[in-house]
Amino acid sequence: MALQTPMMKQYLEIKAQYKDAFLFFRLGDFYELFLDDAVKAAQELEITLTGRGKGEERIPMCGVPYHSADHYISRLLEKGYKIAICEQVEDPKNAKGVVKREVIKLITPGTIMDGKLIVEKENNFLCAVTRFEDQSYGIARADLTTGESRVSLVSEQDDLFHELASSSIKEVVLSPGWTEEDAHRLRQSLSVTLSEEEAEDLPKGYESLCENVEQPKLLRAFGRLLQYLLRTQKRSLEHLQPVQYDPPNEVMKIDLHSRRNLELVETLREKKKKGSLLWAVDETVTAMGGRLLKQWVERPLLSKKEIERRQGLVQSFLDHYFEREELRDELRHVYDLERLVGKVAYGNVNARELVQLRKSLQRIPAIFALVEKIGNQDVNERLQTIDRCESLVDLLEHSLVDDPPVSIKEGGMIRDGFHKELDTYRDASRNGKSWIAELEQKEREATGIKSLKIGYNKVFGYYIEVTKANIHLLEEGRYERKQTLTNAERYVTPELKEKEALILNAEESIVQLEYDLFLQVREQVKDYIRPLQALAQMISELDVIQGFATVSETHHYVRPALQEDRAIAIKGGRHPVVERVIPNGEYVANDVDMKDGRSILLITGPNMAGKSTYMRQLALIAIMGQIGCFVPADEARLPIFDQVFTRIGAADDLASGQSTFMVEMLETKYALQKATQNSLILLDEIGRGTSTYDGMALAQAIIEYIHDEIRAKTLFSTHYHELTALEKELSDVKNVHVSAVEEQGTVVFLHKVVDGQADRSYGIYVAELAGLPNVVTERAETLLAELEGEKEIVASEKEVASTNEPTQLSLFEPEPLEAYKPKGNKQPLSDEEKTVLHDLQSVDVLNTTPLEAIRLLNQWQQKLR
C-alpha cells in the first residue's frame, strides 16, 4: 500500500505532530503536500491536485517549487493558516534508507519574519491570553519582527475583546479550557488565528526580560507567549525587548465597536487605511515611524504631562520649517531598523540587509544634528543618552562591499583588505584568469589560428576550442580531445589542466571563506541589538513628531489647550478626514460648546445634514488631542477623556445572528455600564430599530440615565422630535440642530449646527434624492400633510406634582381613533398607518444598510396587513 512506504510513514509521523498546520514536506526541489492537506491546499492555492499510487490506494498530493514557496506560504497565511516547514536535515548521499527530515519552523500569522509577507507600517503582534481562576485575563503580546513585547491585565471578557482590538493582533494563543463558543466569538470579532499552549512557566534564561513585571498573573501570561514562540520557532529569542507593563488607567479606552465606527485605522466598509484617521494624520516617512503612529492612534494618552510633552515637541518642529524639511529628507534614507535588528537576532539577515543597516546608521549624525538645531530641550537631553553605534558602522564599512548579492552562499560580499587569506585566494583567482587570457593569445600565435579561443563550462572545465577547418594546424600529441561539436573540436593541454585546478580551488575557497566571514560579522552585529533598538525607538518618535508638525501646518491645525474642568470649547472644528475628501473650501466648520448646563447635546435635523459627521468630528478631535497631535479647529479647549463610546450607524451582526436593534442595545449597554463622568458618549438614532413608541421610550430613559447617573459628555442625535421637550426638564440637556432651508421646493442642507430644535426631518425629500418612485413619495407627502394637519403626538397633560423628578413624556398611548377625522371621502388613518409613516419619516437613508431596509419594509408591511 502507498501509505506503508517508508517515506509516507515518515510523513505521517511528522504530520501527527502538526495536525493544525499544512505540512510542507521537502522532496528534492519541491515542497509536497499529501492527503487532506493536499486537497485543501490545492483548493486554496488554485494548483493542480495529483496523486501518488493507483486505484483505491492513490494518495492525493500537490506541490510547489521550494524556490517560490514564499508566494504560496503568504497566500495561506493571509487566509489564517499555519505552515510547518519540513526539510531534509542530512545529505541524501549519506542517508541509510529514508533521508532524515525535521520540521525546522512553524510559520503562523503571528510569527512571520519575512518582510515581504507583512505590512510595512503595521505591527504583527502575536498575543497570548491566559484566563485565571477569578475570570480575569492576562494578556501578553509580542511582535517577533521588531522585538517589542507588552503585558496587561483585564477583569472581564468584554474588556479583553476591546483590549485586543487596540493592537494589530494577528494570532491569539489561548490557555486551555476555552469553550468553543467563546473561541468562535473571539475569532469572528477580531478575525484572528487561534492557537493553544498549555505551558505557562517562564522559560529559563528569559527572566531578565521581566524585570518590570511583578504580578504573577502577568508572568504566567508572558510565560505562555514565550513557550509558544520557542516551540514554534525552534531558536533563541534574544532580540525580544524587556517586557513593558501597560497599566489599565494610562490610555484612553476605546471599545471595538467605537474603533470601527470612528474608522480610526481603517474604513468601516472597505477595510482600507485611506479614509481613516490614521490616513489623515500619517506624514511619517519611515516604516517604524508609521508603526509607532498607528500605536499612538490606537492608544491615546491620559497623562496630561505626557500629552503636553508631545505637544511641545510638535510645536518645536512646527517652528523650524527648514530644519524639519531637511530632517524628513534624511529620514527617508533610513531603512526599517527595528525589523533589520529582528532579522539579525533571528539569524536570517543577509549581506544586502546589513548594508541597509550601515547606510541607515550613517544618516544618524546628520539627523541628530538637525534635531539639536530645532532646540527642544527634552529631546536633546534624550539624544545624549543614545548610542550612535559608530563602531558598528566602522565594522560594516570595512567588511562588506557596497552592493552585495542577496544570497550569502555565492561570494561577492566581503570587501578586499578585510581578511588576508581571502585576499590571497582572490589574487590566485584573478591572476589565474589573467593567465588564461595570456595563454589564449600565446596559443593563437603558436598555431596561427586567429579564431582559437579558451572557454569554460561546468562539465568539462576550461578548454581550447578550434574550428574543424584549422585542426590540421595543431601540434600532434600536445592536445587532448575532450568534446566534438558540429563545426569545432575542444581540447585540453597539461598546462591548461594544471592552471584550471588552481583557479577552481581558489574560487571554491573564496565562496566558503566569504560565507564563514559573513557569519562572523553577523554574529558581531548581535552585540548591538539593544542599542540599535533604542536608536530605532528614537528615530520612530522623531518621525511621528515631525509628521504631526507637517500635517498640522499643511491643514491648519491648532494646539488644543487641556482643561482641568470638564468643559469643551471648540471654535471652527472640522472632521479631519471629511475635509480632505470633499472639494476644497466646501467643508462647513462647526463649534462645540459643552460647558455646565450643556453636558448633553440633543441633536435634531434633516437626514444628510451632517449629524453623524458632527458627532464623529468631536470624538476624533478628542483622540487627536490625546495622542499629542494638533487638531482641526480654529481654537480648541478640551478635557482629557478616559473613554470614548459610540453607537453610530446600523449594520446587522450576521455572523452572530443578531439584529441591528440587538447590536444597538448591546453596544449601548456597554457604554452605560462602563462610562464615567470623564467619558465621551456618542449615540446616534438610538431606538430606531424597534417600534416608534418603544424607541422613544428607550431613548428618553437612556438620556435620563446618562444625565442623572453618569454625567458624561454626550452627543445624542434623534429623529424623535418629541424628545426635545427634555431640555426644559433636565438641567444639562441642550437642544441643537443641523440647519436647512427650503428654496423653491428644494431643500438646501447648511451643515451648520446651531442652538434650538429642528422643525422638520425632510425624510421624504431624501427619499426623492435616493430615487424612490414618484408615486411613493407623492403619496407620502399627502399622508404627511394629513397627519400634520389633523393631530400630532404630544406630551401628556398629566404632570407629576410635588416632586423634583422631570416630567415623563407620554409616548406609549396613541390618541383614540376618533380624534382623527377624514378629509373628503378618504378613510381615517389607523394607528398602524400613523406609526409606519412616522417611522418612514425618521429613517436615515444614507446610514441604512440594504439588509436593514428590507427588514424595515417587511416590518411595515406586516403592520399594514
From Swiss-Prot:
Ranges where the record places region Disordered: 814-833
InterPro entries to which the protein is assigned, alphabetical: DNA_mismatch_repair_MutS, DNA_mismatch_repair_MutS-lik_N, DNA_mismatch_repair_MutS/MSH, DNA_mismatch_repair_MutS_C, DNA_mismatch_repair_MutS_clamp, DNA_mismatch_repair_MutS_core, DNA_mismatch_repair_MutS_N, DNA_mismatch_repair_MutS_sf
Domain of life assignment: Bacteria
Pfam families: MutS_I, MutS_II, MutS_III, MutS_IV, MutS_V
Alphabetized UniProt keyword annotations: ATP-binding, DNA damage, DNA repair, DNA-binding, Nucleotide-binding
GO terms assigned for molecular function: ATP binding; ATP-dependent DNA damage sensor activity; damaged DNA binding; mismatched DNA binding
SUPFAM superfamilies: DNA repair protein MutS, domain I (SSF55271), DNA repair protein MutS, domain II (SSF53150), DNA repair protein MutS, domain III (SSF48334), P-loop containing nucleoside triphosphate hydrolases (SSF52540)
Key word Manganese present: no
Transmembrane spans: none
CDD domains named among the record's database cross-references: ABC_MutS1
PROSITE patterns: DNA_MISMATCH_REPAIR_2
Disulfide bonds: none
Lipid biosynthesis recorded as keyword: no
GO terms under cellular component: cytosol
Cited function: This protein is involved in the repair of mismatches in DNA. It is possible that it carries out the mismatch recognition step. This protein has a weak ATPase activity.
Cross-referenced NCBIfam families: mutS1 (TIGR01070), PRK05399.1 (NF003810)
Record family assignment: Belongs to the DNA mismatch repair MutS family.
Protein name, entry field: DNA mismatch repair protein MutS
Gene for this chain: mutS
